[in-house]
Structures are given as structure tokens and as C-alpha cells.
Amino acid sequence: MRPPGCRDVPSARPALPLLLLLLSPLLLGALHGVGAGSGAPAELRVRVRLPDSQVIEESLQADSDADSISLDLRKPDGTLISFIADFKKDVKIFRALILGELEKGQSQFQALCFVTRLHHNDIIPSEAMAKLRQKNPRAVRQAEEVRGLEQLHMDIAVNFSQGGLLSPHLHNVCAEATDAIYTRQEDVQFWTERGVDSSVFEALPKALEQAELPRCGRVGDRGKPCTCHYSLSLAWYPCMLKYCHSRDRPAPYKCGIRSCRKSYTFDFYVPQKQLCLWDEDP
């Protein structure tokens, strides 16, 4: 890993055409590389009611050949959220395309990627997901279970050029966030113990230095380093399999899914406040 302080300041990304930002989550699934296997990926489109009563649409795809699941949604403010569960590599990828406020001098969009370890009880297996069938596509659904908020301190950067060694999905999903891909030391240890090369990861400033940095919302100078905060939610996803009992069967059998909603907050170092202009001090 590179020593702390040697990471380049992310350069301004070229403006993403507005047409791409307006694409449906269904079309965005093609960016993930999901479905690269011989079988066509199974897809569900789900309308979901948020806690504030707004309704969004999610696209979920499963590829049992690649052993992966993807989820795409567009938040009411236009932000595009993508999630990949890569079961082969024990990797979760969260990608956010955040629309900028041009009147505030922000760029048209900013991309972030967060990469963490996938635990196999986080979401149902890809094979089970691939067997789900679309029912009542116009029905508005709510998650049966709200899982606890997960707060993650991202203290390691991922080297985009080597990211394919961590997950083959990373190059496609995080292509717009090459200088803003973050993970955690504890997850790095897990992956390197399983053979992932350490060149994939780059050190960020030490935890003590980060602890002393103010939150970006409290910094006035846009050129100063600070600790950025970003939150996202997966509004509806199949988190568990349901099992039923029958007198005719000696053992429980799979008979459905349980849906969950889960929120995440990520804290991470940025070398300039201008890379975190959405983070307003509460």
C-alpha cells in the first residue's frame, strides 16, 4: 500500500451526459457487467414506498453463473444508487452518482464507491434470487423488516487500476469514481488473508489524523481537507429465505422471501471540501 498522504487529489470528472443520468435503473444494470455468464440474468422491478411516503422503483438482477446480485434505484433527488453483491469474492460494492447543484458552483455530478466485505447472511443467495418471478409489478411494497443502521469508517482507498483483483465488477461499477473508492482496514485484512494482493489498496491519512479533522460541513475553505459523511439506504431487498413446514414433508422447505430495508453511513477522508459539498452541518 502507498504511504499516507501520497494519494492524488481527485481531478474534476468530465460532465456525464444528462441523458445517462436520466436512464432508468434497468438500463444502468448493464454497467455492472452482471449477466456475463451464459444464462440471462433474472430481473425484478419493484415499486417501493419510502418512510416519507414517496415511491421509487428498484431494479434487481441476479446472475447465478457469476454468483452476483445487483440493485439499482434512483432517489427522489435524482441520485443514482447501485449495489452489487459478489458472492464469489465476498465483496459488496455501493456506488452513488450524486447530482451537483450548478448554482452553487458544483460539478454536474460526483461519483463515490464504497467496498466492504459481503457476509452471506446479508442477502439471499444469487441462485435463490434468480428463481424469483415478477408478481404484481404495479404494486407498491414496503420492507417487512428494517435492519439497523450500519456506520462505517472508511480508512483505506482502493486502487482502481488493480480493482479487478478484488472483484471483476469494480471496474464497471466504479468507472466514474476512480479516485473515490473507499474500504476499511478490517475488510482489507480479510481479503488479503484470502489472497488478494495488497497493491489493490492505498493508505489514507492515519485514523488519529482523521479524528482531528473537522466534518466537511464545518469547514469554510473549500480547499481544506476534512472528514466527509455520506448516507444511503437500500429501500427493499430480499434479505432472507422463508421456510415452511408441511405434514407431507419431513424437513422444512423454501417457500418465499423476507424483505428488508437497511441504511448505511460512510465517513471518509477527502483532501478538499469541494469533494464533499453535499455534507451540510446539521
From Swiss-Prot:
Protein's recorded name: Out at first protein homolog
Similarity field: Belongs to the OAF family.
Pfam families for the chain: OAF_C, OAF_N
Keyword Signal: yes
Signal peptide as annotated in the record: 1-29
Organism classification: Eukaryota, Metazoa, Chordata, Craniata, Vertebrata
Primary gene name: Oaf
Keywords: Signal
PANTHER family per UniProt: OUT AT FIRST, OUT AT FIRST PROTEIN HOMOLOG
InterPro entries to which the protein is assigned, alphabetical: Oaf (IPR026315), Oaf_C (IPR053897), OAF_N (IPR053894)
Keyword Signal: yes
